[in-house]
Amino acid sequence: SADTLKAIRQNEAPKPLDLKVADTFELFDQLNKLIHQRKSENVDYQEFVDMIHELLSTNASLSFASEVKSLGLKDADLMLLLWGCNMLVSNNDRVIIPSDYEDLYEGEGLLFSRQVRALKNGSSPLIEKGLFQLMDNDGRAHSDAHTLTSHVCEEILKDLGIASPTEK
């Protein structure tokens, strides 16, 4: 990680990130820190993916971590699901558009393009598994805008007490 490189340059031992947490709220604190690192410290995509897997594995006893792992998503889809969940939990932002997750795939242009295209044409596993849905605005769907489904809010994020998109 960037902290590791900094520590090596300064001839210090790197500080390991403590990924063990007590509950889902703390897990999202850690997830938010990792996302911030990815964006601000130019953490490599694969290194970010590895850190996320370690976070989920270390906290497999939490229902959120086990639910997410049980979905069997490929890395690119899992990262986007977690990115979307973090947007909702951290910023109460339900709308997910490509510019929101462009930083996730920084340096991975082909992967980003594939994700945008799959979401737009409805072939994404996130849509097929009922995790993302097209955003509906006054009866019109927007092909570039998606939201987490009520299933994600009611089942996967249940420990956080987040209201489903249909509840206001």
Predicted regions and their residues:
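Intrinsically disordered, low-complexity N-terminal extensions of AAA+/P-loop NTPases
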Residues: 1-168
